[in-house]
Amino acid sequence: MARVAWGLLWLLLGSAGAQYEKYSFRGFPPEDLMPLAAAYGHALEQYEGESWRESARYLEAALRLHRLLRDSEAFCHANCSGPAPAAKPDPDGGRADEWACELRLFGRVLERAACLRRCKRTLPAFQVPYPPRQLLRDFQSRLPYQYLHYALFKANRLEKAVAAAYTFLQRNPKHELTAKYLNYYQGMLDVADESLTDLEAQPYEAVFLRAVKLYNSGDFRSSTEDMERALSEYLAVFARCLAGCEGAHEQVDFKDFYPAIADLFAESLQCKVDCEANLTPNVGGYFVDKFVATMYHYLQFAYYKLNDVRQAARSAASYMLFDPKDSVMQQNLVYYRFHRARWGLEEEDFQPREEAMLYHNQTAELRELLEFTHMYLQSDDEMELEETEPPLEPEDALSDAEFEGEGDYEEGMYADWWQEPDAKGDEAEAEPEPELA
């Protein structure tokens, strides 16, 4: 009955835009709001029944709802995570001071909880049931795009199918079957690789690529401007990612007070550690190794070419935080120090930049804490709070023979269809459909 009600509600969507058009997490249209799990579940049901247009419509809606939830979580937690007041140690010290410190800690927790409750009470994303953890992981890995590209293709929306397939591959570059579909779509539309669009791309990715191109062309001034902007935008997105990891958590076991808190904290830690990898750009099918360090590497040489040795030295010192054994950068720092009098450099000019120190310390401490939880808090299935759903993909990789032959492959993911066109431009085997919302 509830499913029918949601279905009737979504008939009102009409010509609503794609998941990122005219978006506002504060003023999300009430008529577009529904539980993420319901939207995604209905999309998969329609996919199973080969109702391609309806499936694509709900998949796009689910992606939009996921973004709404993600941005709303990050907003509230960022606004409720101000610096704690300075602690005043008890002059007597000892157990009294320890007791007071614990009370201050839990007082701070209660204050933040009250702030979050006030914030979430005003935002649309929290007016519907919260999705389960496994579903959020699926969206983080861009799994919905694996369904979406094929549903769009079968609905004769090839341009959007190309973007959806490419978006999935940007996070899953080794998924051979989707790569083959993307090549097929590109061949039908004559779409060059340079024209492909990542629907989940962060703003800093394009700025970083432009900075690298300017660097390679010798325009070091413009390159440093763009690289500094890319660095600043990345760190802002990283901070929002950390804040978004403090959202709702499920716990189904009865536990003592401190173990229960530790479980929730460990889950949040894992999410925060994953932020670095999840935000790393994919360039040409490869993730940029040590992305933040790479930006400082470019800045170091570009500033040197601009004769701004002070910034070059600080960029080199910042890079060394992430790769202290890099012999080339070590030699660069030795060179800067040797000529420090010539350039008027002070000792402070050989210190890492403030934002580099903060980012390095954050990521290092998060990894250390997570390693601690893995070593000491996972015995006796302490961290296994729920059973997760089995993966939607088969465990065995598909061979080319399976792909080219007839019959089933990736059961539950793609229809029993694959046929190379006789000539470029042949249409897919599907009835013409009206425009998708």
From Swiss-Prot:
<dbReference type="InterPro" id="IPR052284">
    <property type="entry name" value="Collagen_mod_leprecan"/>
</dbReference>
<comment type="function">
    <text>Part of a complex composed of PLOD1, P3H3 and P3H4 that catalyzes hydroxylation of lysine residues in collagen alpha chains and is required for normal assembly and cross-linking of collagen fibrils. Required for normal bone density and normal skin stability via its role in hydroxylation of lysine residues in collagen alpha chains and in collagen fibril assembly.</text>
</comment>
<dbReference type="GO" id="GO:0005730">
    <property type="term" value="C:nucleolus"/>
</dbReference>
<dbReference type="GO" id="GO:0032964">
    <property type="term" value="P:collagen biosynthetic process"/>
</dbReference>
<comment type="similarity">
    <text>Belongs to the leprecan family.</text>
</comment>
<feature type="compositionally biased region" description="Acidic residues">
    <location>
        <begin position="381"/>
        <end position="413"/>
    </location>
</feature>
<dbReference type="GO" id="GO:0007130">
    <property type="term" value="P:synaptonemal complex assembly"/>
</dbReference>
<comment type="subunit">
    <text>Interacts with PLOD1, P3H3 and PPIB. Identified in a complex with PLOD1 and P3H3.</text>
</comment>
<keyword id="KW-0732">Signal</keyword>
<dbReference type="Pfam" id="PF23557">
    <property type="entry name" value="TPR_leprecan"/>
</dbReference>
<keyword id="KW-0256">Endoplasmic reticulum</keyword>
<dbReference type="GO" id="GO:0005783">
    <property type="term" value="C:endoplasmic reticulum"/>
</dbReference>
<dbReference type="GO" id="GO:0000795">
    <property type="term" value="C:synaptonemal complex"/>
</dbReference>
<dbReference type="GO" id="GO:1902494">
    <property type="term" value="C:catalytic complex"/>
</dbReference>
<dbReference type="GO" id="GO:0043231">
    <property type="term" value="C:intracellular membrane-bounded organelle"/>
</dbReference>
<protein>
    <recommendedName>
        <fullName>Endoplasmic reticulum protein SC65</fullName>
    </recommendedName>
</protein>
<feature type="region of interest" description="Disordered">
    <location>
        <begin position="381"/>
        <end position="437"/>
    </location>
</feature>
<feature type="compositionally biased region" description="Acidic residues">
    <location>
        <begin position="428"/>
        <end position="437"/>
    </location>
</feature>
<keyword id="KW-0325">Glycoprotein</keyword>
<feature type="signal peptide">
    <location>
        <begin position="1"/>
        <end position="18"/>
    </location>
</feature>
<dbReference type="GO" id="GO:0000794">
    <property type="term" value="C:condensed nuclear chromosome"/>
</dbReference>
<dbReference type="InterPro" id="IPR011990">
    <property type="entry name" value="TPR-like_helical_dom_sf"/>
</dbReference>
<dbReference type="InterPro" id="IPR056585">
    <property type="entry name" value="Leprecan_dom"/>
</dbReference>
<dbReference type="GO" id="GO:0017185">
    <property type="term" value="P:peptidyl-lysine hydroxylation"/>
</dbReference>
<feature type="glycosylation site" description="N-linked (GlcNAc...) asparagine">
    <location>
        <position position="361"/>
    </location>
</feature>
<dbReference type="GO" id="GO:0030199">
    <property type="term" value="P:collagen fibril organization"/>
</dbReference>
<dbReference type="GO" id="GO:0046849">
    <property type="term" value="P:bone remodeling"/>
</dbReference>
